């Protein structure tokens, strides 16, 4: 390149005589290599070009001109621009250097709070993506928290997700102050820690105005003088290029060396398949995605790191052990505990790849999933001819032989294994053989089958236990056919037997259903079979039929009462033994235990189903059930309580005993079905049950309390007249007139024995009295009582009956009946329509045909009274209605609570006063309604509640609410178990309902839900029966607010 020279002033101000010629040459040299400005205009370039025409070129001119010529050589700066390629390279190198500095600064900052890690004098820092330290691990184990790494704890305590962090943006360590905050969260110990920020620390990529780098640069250091860029830029560029080339070469060599080292560490060329065996020529990117990034073979048993790189399990574990806990691809922190299985879609694609068989004589192409099996067939075929064969046809493979031939061929090996097992393993041949099989699978890299076999050896199994599957089926309301469809679908999709087949569930059912456990009665029960393996029986069994008997058109299924009680006790075995331990009683105590049983019975209305064959039965149902309320043991001179039902009104503890499609008003049918059951119950009262529980024969006595009946059914089974009778009460002999005149002061006088005596008087009429006189003598007993009930109040139906009466009072107050008692029927209907419309608008209460528990609960509130008062013009009536409702709401908890002495002691103490004031209001302000009459449940509420509480301790615990909830389950089970025969359908319903109430299955279901919801999830929901999980334990501590 020719560069023109123009005579200009020298660089030095000294005279020419004293300047050395080499100095001038050096100045000329620097001017020669100086790079001109990139912004120089075209006019300046043109001027320089014109001025250089006709001048000698650089090659033609000497280094120093003759002094005689009188000219001082001076080289004009060259007019050329830097190539864009070099400009971009300089820019990229600068950016890379800035990023490296930024990343170095990040290493000294805390990931959570952003403070500098240098401020800690002990230099305590913790890896964000590492396993928790031993102290924290011990604390988590003590608190029963399942955690092994910091990311989960950081996400829980600080609400920061660090699993997606990038090293170039986020710091990789956190400070001791944040560690102490997490430690305090889990330990609950007060300590002086604080969080220095008011918001979450946000991290951004490096930018020209980066706060992190600017903070690191500023300070009191003296700034270095910048070299003269104009003079040294070209020389510096050449040196930088040479250095970068050397670094690039070094990096490539290091990468190649690192790859070779990792391949040497993995050493898997003999067990993993090369990508050259792929049958299809896939794109390079796809091949890279399905190959291990360490050994570059096709992925075998792939695992995924937290940074989303995929490796063979053996390769990554070996590399982590030798090279440290970093990802081989991106150097991101990685630990063996972070390895997870890739997503199923990726595994499906990987397993479906077609590969060529590596055997030289085989040209088959098989899927990767079946490759091991295919190759093993080659080995087996080769091994077929290895054995000594003294002529004849070739030896057949072992698996193709009959069982007898297999025994003959393996006889010598079997003897050797037996000798080894006897010598080393105590004769456990099975464990030795399973372990050999397990090692063979591991050696052939078939880890999935090996894991399943190992789980079976440990008793866990690869899937769920049959009891867990049964609990899932029962609690999700799946019939057998629906469960079987789900089982087949899951097995076909996953290839694993996660759920157990139906026959395994039926084996688990047998243990839980009545008729499995042996027992004995001392003395034996009268008129009851001594056999114990009795399951579901027909409701009419044991009924002696004759031509004159009442023809029973019904379908009934039941358990035998004693067998059902034994099954219920064995289902509660763990609870009973745990209760004994909690009372510091020895496990070997054999009793006698006293079991208190609540009995419930209720009729159901329309249960019509449009299917099933069988007799024409009424589409109404009756259910008889029982609940084990309390179990005590005689210890010394006192009875110690070892079990008490925590939720006595739950449908989960109300066990069905008898189901029948019959009308509860049909006295003959009801008597025919329930009489054998009542006979068993009467026989059990005078005998003791001998049952083996916990390996010890124990003695049980039973106390039966029939309290879960509504008033209609009590009158039916106790032989009393219907609820419209003049004898208003099932607890005392008061008539309706007597009860209205004396609202409060009555005592309980009726009993089952007295009713039986009165029935005999009614039947025989020994005094030869008239009907009216006889009726007055027996106080309303008109039929033979056949079920013994406890004189009590059913809390649920008491609420419903009282709410219906208040609903009527609201209508009468709207119509101002206290002024005009003689209102027509049309006017009364208009008042009801007005009330319904207003309640729907104000209280969102939709009108119903018949009062139910939910409507009663919503209706009986102060808000409802306020809404009704808007329709009543008189202020005085407002006050009377409000006071009546307030008194009722003060009295209601006494008969609704399970233990009023603990739950509402004040209301219990004030009950007598409140009931007298309530009665006074009825007889004065509401005299138009209650003069000479009163409703059945108002009478029981005002007169008998304190006496029942004093006798039983509670009314609410003995209510029929659990049985009412069971009625809803009956409808659901019946729809679910629809079969062609109604007879079998009732068996399915009874069996499914019994399993639904099993405490054993409920524990399995709770444990299954706890495992499913465990882990550090942001919105985990723990079942109510579970102990406090980590979510609750964290939230109950101090709330972490930034």
Swiss-Prot record:
Give the signal peptide as a residue range, or say none if absent: none
**Name this polypeptide is given:** V(D)J recombination-activating protein 1
Identify the SUPFAM superfamilies for this entry.
beta-beta-alpha zinc fingers, RING/U-box
Q: Which organism is it from?
A: Oryctolagus cuniculus (Rabbit)
Q: Which SMART domains match?
A: RING (SM00184)
Query: Where are its TM segments located?
Result: none
Region Disordered: list its residue ranges. 40-80
Post-translational modification note: Autoubiquitinated in the presence of CDC34/UBCH3.
């Amino acid at each position: 390149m020719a560069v023109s020279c123009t005579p200009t002033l020298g660089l030095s101000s000294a005279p020419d005589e004293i300047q050395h010629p080499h100095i001038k040459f050096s100045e000329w040299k620097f001017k020669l290599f100086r790079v001109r400005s990139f912004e120089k205009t075209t006019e300046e370039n043109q001027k320089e070009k014109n001025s250089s025409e006709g001048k000698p070129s650089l090659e033609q001119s000497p280094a120093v001109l003759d002094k005689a010529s009188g000219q001082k050589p001076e080289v004009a700066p060259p007019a050329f621009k830097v190539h864009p390629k070099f400009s971009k390279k300089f820019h990229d190198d600068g950016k890379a250097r800035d990023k490296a500095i930024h990343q170095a600064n990040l290493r000294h900052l805390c990931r959570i709070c952003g403070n500098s890690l240098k401020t800690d004098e002990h230099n305590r820092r913790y890896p964000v993506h590492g396993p928790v330290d031993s102290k924290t691990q011990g604390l988590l184990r003590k608190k029963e928290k399942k955690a092994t790494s910091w990311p989960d704890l950081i996400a829980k305590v600080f609400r920061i997700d660090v699993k997606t962090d990038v090293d170039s943006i986020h710091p990789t360590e956190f400070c001791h102050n944040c560690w102490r905050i997490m430690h305090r969260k889990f330990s609950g110990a007060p300590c002086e820690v604080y969080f220095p920020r008011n918001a979450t620390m946000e991290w951004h990529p490096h930018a020209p105005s980066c706060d992190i780098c600017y903070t690191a640069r500023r300070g009191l250091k003296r700034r270095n003088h910048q070299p003269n860029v104009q003079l040294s830029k070209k020389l510096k560029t050449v040196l930088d290029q040479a250095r970068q080339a050397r670094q690039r070469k070094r990096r490539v060599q290091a990468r190649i060396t690192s790859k070779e080292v990792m391949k040497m560490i993995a050493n898997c060329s003999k067990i993993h398949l090369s990508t050259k065996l792929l049958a299809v020529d896939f794109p390079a990117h796809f091949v890279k995605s399905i190959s291990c990034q360490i050994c570059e073979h096709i992925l075998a048993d792939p695992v995924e790191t937290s940074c989303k790189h995929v490796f063979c399990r053996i390769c990554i574990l070996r590399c982590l052990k030798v090279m440290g806990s970093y990802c081989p691809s991106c150097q991101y922190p990685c630990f063996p505990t972070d390895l997870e299985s890739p997503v199923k879609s990726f595994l499906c694609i990987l397993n479906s790849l077609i590969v060529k068989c590596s055997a030289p004589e085989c040209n088959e192409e098989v899927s990767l999933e079946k490759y091991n099996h295919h190759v093993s067939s080659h080995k087996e075929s080769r091994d077929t001819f290895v054995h000594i064969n003294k002529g004849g046809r070739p030896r057949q493979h072992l698996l193709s032989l009959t069982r007898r031939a297999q025994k003959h061929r393996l006889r010598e090996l079997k003897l050797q294994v037996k000798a080894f097992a006897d010598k080393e393993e105590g004769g456990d041949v099975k464990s030795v053989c399973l372990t050999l099989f397990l090692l063979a699978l591991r050696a052939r890299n078939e880890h999935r089958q090996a894991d399943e076999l190992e789980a079976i050896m440990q008793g866990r199994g690869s899937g769920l236990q049959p009891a867990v599957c049964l609990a899932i089926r029962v609690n999700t309301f799946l019939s057998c056919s629906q469960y079987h469809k789900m089982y087949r679908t899951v097995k076909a999709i996953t290839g694993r037997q996660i759920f157990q087949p139906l026959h395994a569930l039926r084996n688990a059912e047998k243990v839980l259903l009545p008729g499995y456990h042996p027992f004995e009665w001392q003395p034996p029960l009268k008129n009851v079979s001594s056999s114990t393996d009795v399951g579901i029986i027909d409701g009419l069994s044991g009924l002696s039929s004759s031509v004159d008997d009442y023809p029973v058109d019904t379908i009934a299924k039941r358990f035998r009462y004693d067998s059902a009680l034994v099954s219920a006790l064995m289902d509660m075995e763990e609870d009973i033994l745990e209760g004994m331990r909690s009372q510091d009683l020895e496990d070997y105590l054999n009793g006698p235990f006293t079991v208190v049983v609540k009995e419930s019975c209720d009729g159901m209305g329309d249960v019509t189903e449009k299917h099933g064959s069988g007799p024409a039965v009424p589409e109404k149902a009756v259910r008889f059930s029982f609940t084990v309320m309390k179990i005590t043991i005689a210890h010394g001179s006192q009875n110690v309580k070892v079990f008490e039902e925590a939720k006595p009104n739950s449908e989960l503890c109300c066990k069905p005993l008898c189901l029948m499609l019959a009308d509860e008003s049909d006295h003959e049918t009801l008597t025919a079905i329930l009489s054998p059951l009542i006979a068993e119950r009467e026989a059990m009262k005078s005998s003791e049950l001998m049952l083996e529980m916990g390996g010890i024969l124990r003695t049980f006595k039973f106390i039966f309390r029939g309290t879960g009946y509504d008033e209609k059914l009590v009158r039916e089974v106790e032989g009393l007249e219907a609820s419209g009778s003049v004898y208003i009460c099932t607890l005392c002999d008061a008539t309706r007139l007597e009860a209205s005149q004396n609202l409060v002061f009555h005592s309980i006088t009726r009993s089952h024995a007295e009713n039986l005596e009165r029935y005999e008087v009614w039947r025989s009429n020994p005094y030869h009295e008239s009907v009216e006189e006889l009726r007055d003598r027996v106080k309303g007993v008109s039929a033979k009582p056949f079920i013994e009930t406890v004189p009590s109040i059913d809390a649920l139906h008491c609420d419903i009956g009282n709410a219906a009466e208040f609903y009527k009072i609201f209508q009468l107050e709207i119509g101002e009946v206290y002024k005009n008692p003689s209102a027509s029927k049309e006017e009364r209907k208009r008042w009801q329509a007005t009330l319904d419309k207003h309640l729907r608008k104000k209280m969102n209460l939709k009108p119903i045909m018949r009062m139910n528990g939910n409507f009663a609960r919503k209706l009986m509130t102060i808000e409802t009274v306020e809404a009704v008062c808007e329709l009543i013009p008189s202020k005085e009536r407002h006050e009377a209605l409000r006071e009546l409702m307030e008194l009722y709401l003060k009295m209601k908890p006494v008969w609704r609570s399970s233990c009023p002495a603990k739950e509402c002691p004040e209301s219990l103490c004030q009950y007598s006063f409140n009931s007298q004031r309530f009665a006074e209001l009825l007889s004065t302000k509401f005299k138009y309604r209650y003069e000479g009459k009163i409703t059945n449940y108002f009478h029981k509420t005002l007169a008998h509640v304190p006496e029942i509480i004093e006798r039983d301790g509670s009314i609410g615990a003995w209510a029929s609410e659990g049985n009412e909830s069971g009625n809803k389950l009956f409808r659901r089970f019946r729809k679910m178990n629809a079969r062609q025969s109604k007879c079998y359908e009732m068996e399915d319903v009874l069996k499914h309902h019994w399993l639904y109430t099993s405490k054993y299955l409920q524990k399995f279901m709770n444990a299954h839900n706890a495992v499913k919801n465990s882990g550090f999830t942001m919105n985990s929901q723990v079942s109510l029966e579970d102990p406090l999980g980590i979510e609750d334990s964290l939230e109950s501590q101090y709330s972490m607010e930034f």
